[in-house]
Amino acid sequence: MKPINTFFSSFLLALTLGLPATSQAEVEIPIMDLVDVRGIRENQLVGYGLVVGLAGQGDRNQVKFTSQSITNMLRQFGVQIDDSMDPKLRNVASVSVTASVDPMAGPGQTLDVVVSSIGDAKSLRGGTLLLTPLRGIDGEVYAIAQGSVVVGGLSAEGKSGSKVEVNTPTAGRVPNGATLEREIKTDFNQRDEITLNLRKPSFTTAKNIAREINNTFGPNVAVAINKARVDMRAPKDTQQRVIMMSMLEEMSVVEGRKPARIVFNSRTGTVVIGKNVKVGEAAVSHGNLTVRISESEKVSQPNAFADGETKVVNQTDIDVNEELAQMVIWPPGTELNTIVDAVNSLGATPTDLMSILQALNEAGALNAELVVI
């Protein structure tokens, strides 16, 4: 079996060496723009808080938990309120507070927080977020948030019920509104190897990354495990590991071929066609059949001296119109620009384009994946 394995390895090497060299026109992309490093990622925090100072735009009486939250907060400051008493506050809103913690952020760093209304408040504009603890998935408090809420939207309502609303007035941000109190632990420095997870899995990209790392740091430092993962041996010394990651940030490789894909957004009518989309030989004709049915009333008048009554009868008019459609023939291997020009020449709308591409896919003439979002 050993000679066979040796022959097979030599055969693969010969195939690799026989591939055409990378074109100078191909753009090299920084490795760190193609991968995520295991153990280095953002962490999400969430909390429940109160926004005050809303000038009558806060939660209404139907939102009971806002009143309960105010009562509990005032009790912490020594203000006693009877449980049966409803404060009926209009200047307060219950909100969710979220924040993203950058990888390896340390205590004392500030974070931007997003504040969103939970109840039926009309606007958070001009409000102030009171002291709010932010917790991680483990339930521990990692940051404290407080500050003035910046809202990009606005809302105005008249007594007659007319209303004008711009953007979303019930959500805003507090820039640098949270302070990180604890560091979120990571196992990055404890692992014997560094794992690079490709954002867009590709065997070619994984091979190019491993080869570039080995060319820089020496043979057998990195190995492509599969099309979505590359492992590289790393020094245990923290300083050397930082230097290694710094050098990795400066490396660039050529990305592998992207899959042929067409994306439809049926809600907005958006169609995005990838670069590598091609079609086989096909003839396309697209026309519109329009049927219009209209109802009208007509007076039925009998002849003079004849028995009969004057009545109003309904008359139905049906008009069928089929527009003349051109036929376009695509040769095998037709590329993106030819497809777009041909579809535009037919006068097709984005919705028509969806129908044409779906029909081509059913006919087996489209070598691309259709994705509907």
Curated annotation (Swiss-Prot):
It is found in: Periplasm; Bacterial flagellum basal body. InterPro entries: Flag_FlgI (IPR001782). One of its GO terms (molecular function) is structural molecule activity. Residues 1-25 form the signal peptide. Keywords: Bacterial flagellum, Periplasm, Signal. One of its GO terms (biological process) is bacterial-type flagellum-dependent cell motility. Pfam families: FlgI. GO terms for cellular component: bacterial-type flagellum basal body, distal rod, P ring; outer membrane-bounded periplasmic space. Belongs to the FlgI family. Assembles around the rod to form the L-ring and probably protects the motor/basal body from shearing forces during rotation. The basal body constitutes a major portion of the flagellar organelle and consists of four rings (L,P,S, and M) mounted on a central rod. HAMAP family: FlgI. NCBIfam families: PRK05303.1 (NF003676). This is Flagellar P-ring protein 1. The lineage of its organism: Bacteria, Pseudomonadati, Pseudomonadota, Gammaproteobacteria, Vibrionales.
